[in-house]
Every structure is written in structure tokens, then in C-alpha cells.
């Protein structure tokens, strides 16, 4: 059995927190194992003056980490699952899906306690087309502007007065112990989360079963089921990370309750679908919900988004 395991991770404070968390969990479960971190920047980290949807390409936050693994410099990579492409490069696989943290989006403002309190014409910041579509649908009177950078950078722009409010992932703020910045969490009814939001995944080389044996102890089966359903819906819609697609799976007894949506960027049209299915076949349920959305015209909305990017 390996004595040392090397984790490729992004350099941002949140990514480092996630890698440190996985390191601690692995060392707790495997006595004598030493876990090392290899921090690096990715394409998505370096290009901060262009909306993510316009940069294009899959693996904006994952490719450089995979390159380190290919070069033999790292054994695994820790990812926020919402950044992981629907299809991984050949030879790579997800060896563990960790227990999901809060999947919601958080409303953050220095002047307003609630999203509904924002005055007409208020400037709302988000980097997500999914959030933009849903929040514009709820409040077409707002001005939604792009917001890039890590969590600290985004909060700094809010504090500098560039925005009246911003929306960030609840899980990221809580992991960085910035709970006090959250004015309230947006319900899934207001803003359906991104695929696998709040979930961490560990990527490894399929040809290395020894590594899989070490990491699969962290796999959380209930979260894995939810992740499979959400990613199957997203994959059928041919959605990447930067698309106006929301999806949220919940477990109810032996069933999965899956909600999905596709939204026009200006919020003028929001298509919704939901269904229940067996936990034994989450991917079939995901594809079914996607097909329902496509029947409503989701393909045309997404084509417009890709054409604008």
C-alpha cells in the first residue's frame, strides 16, 4: 500500500480548504499515510476579465490538475463537482464523491437583508448564467453584472461599492468560515442549484487500483446517487459548467426526487421539469427529466446561449 499520496489542487483559498479537508480525512482513515498537496493555477483562475461562458472549453478548472497526474507528479485531484466536465478524459475516473454540503446559493449584501428588498435598478453580481437567468426571472427590474474572482475578491468588490449585492455558493462561504456574510440562503424554488453544487469529488487514474482503494473510503453513497442523477440530466442536455441549467436531486425513502430547469439568459423564459424514480437507476431519471425539458424547447434556449458565447 502507498505510503504517500499527492493531491493536485487549485491555489484559491477555497480549493486549498477542500484539498486540506480531503488530506485530513484520508490520513484519519489510513494510519501511516502521508498526503501532500501540489497547488497550482488553472486556466479558469488566470482569466478573470472575461465571463466564464465566453472563455469556452471544458475543464477550465480541471485540465492543469489532470496534466500533473499524467506527468506522474500527482496521484489524485480534488474538485468542486460543479466544475467537473460531464465526460472525463480517457483514463481518468471519479473514485469518490464526498458527502454533500449545503447546495444552495447565498444572498450577500451590506445594505439589504433579503433578495426581495433590493430596489429597482439595483446592481447584482454573479459569475453564473444559471443564477442570472433565475434571478432575472424573479426580478427583471435588477441589473445583473458579471462577477469573477475567488470568494475574497468577489466580497472585496461588493465592499468597494461595485455591487449592491452578490450571490455566491453557500457551501464556499461556510467552508471559509464567512457565514456572517450570508444575509439569507436562496431556496431551490427561487434559485435551483448547479449540478452537484456543494459536493467534492476525487479524480484518479483508472489504471491505479491502489489509489482507488485508498480514496473510496470517503465515498458517500447517498450523495453519489444524487450526483449521478444530476450529472445525467446535465449531460443529456449537453450542458457544461457554464450554462443556465439548474438541477437538484433529493432522496425520499427509496426514491429520488429530481428537479431541473433551463433558463433564457434574460430570465424571459424558464423551463421546468421534475420527476421521481428509483435510487437504483439515478441516471435514467436524469435523462428522463432532460428529455422533458428538451420537449419544452430547452435545446433552442441552450443553442442561443452557445451562439452568444
Swiss-Prot record:
Pfam families named in the record: Porphobil_deam, Porphobil_deamC
Cofactor(s) needed: dipyrromethane
Catalytic activity: 4 porphobilinogen + H2O = hydroxymethylbilane + 4 NH4(+)
GO terms under biological process: protoporphyrinogen IX biosynthetic process
Enzyme Commission number(s) of this protein: 2.5.1.61
Entry's cofactor comment: Binds 1 dipyrromethane group covalently.
Known pathway: Porphyrin-containing compound metabolism; protoporphyrin-IX biosynthesis; coproporphyrinogen-III from 5-aminolevulinate: step 2/4
S-(dipyrrolylmethanemethyl)cysteine carried by residues: 241
Keywords: Porphyrin biosynthesis, Transferase
Functional note: Tetrapolymerization of the monopyrrole PBG into the hydroxymethylbilane pre-uroporphyrinogen in several discrete steps.
Further details from the record: The porphobilinogen subunits are added to the dipyrromethane group.
Protein name from the UniProt record: Porphobilinogen deaminase
